[in-house]
Amino acid sequence: MLKKRIIVCLDVKDGRTTKGVKFQNNIDIGEPVEMAAEYYRQCVDELVFYDIIASARGRGPILDLISRVASQVFIPFCVGGGIGTVEDIRSTILAGAEKVSLNSQAVKNPSLITEGARIFGNQCIVLGMDAAKDDEMPSGYRVYINGGRVKTDLDALAWAKKAVDLGAGEIVLNSMDAD
């Protein structure tokens, strides 16, 4: 039997942790370094940190914040948001992340998954996928990017399979309908 794991996802916007409902109306709920440290003290198994506006704003990861979070948690730490190049992957890992989550940038440039897996190993490459119900899609779910703001033509199941074939070692599925 598989062991159940508690994985906490922190959505970060403008350097603050936020909480929204169905990817909308995010409100400030705290300072991300303090929240990460508190979850670590509560013995969560893994921490996922999403900069939910980096890709939409066309900027890279916030390395200083990643480094400060990494200094407080000693569990697997995955970071997503604004990671669009191999150098972004490298700098995010050097800042303290053990894994990177590729979402919008992977849709725009699927070879980033392959290159990242080749250089850093597929255990470091996580496909982050925001999906919502859509009867037009073969699986019944459509992929969205840029924090759920932009609809794609990708079927969620087909994209997940392709990402694994490209080298993604894990998938984090964010259900926009159940968020």
Language-model segments: what does each one mean?
Residues 42, 50, 72, 95-96, ...:
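Structural motif
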Residues 70-100:
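Catalytic cores of alpha/beta
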Residues 5-11:
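Short, hydrophobic/glycine-enriched beta-strand segments
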Residues 12-14, 18-19, 23-25, 93, ...:
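Conserved anion-binding
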Residues 9, 56-80, 111-130:
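Alpha-helix-loop-beta-strand connector modules within alpha/beta enzyme cores
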Residues 2, 17-60:
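N-terminal beta-alpha supersecondary unit
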Residues 46-64, 104, 172-179:
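Glycine-rich, proline-tolerant flexible connector loops at the mouths of alpha/beta enzymes
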Residues 28-40, 84-90, 152-162:
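Short, acidic/polar
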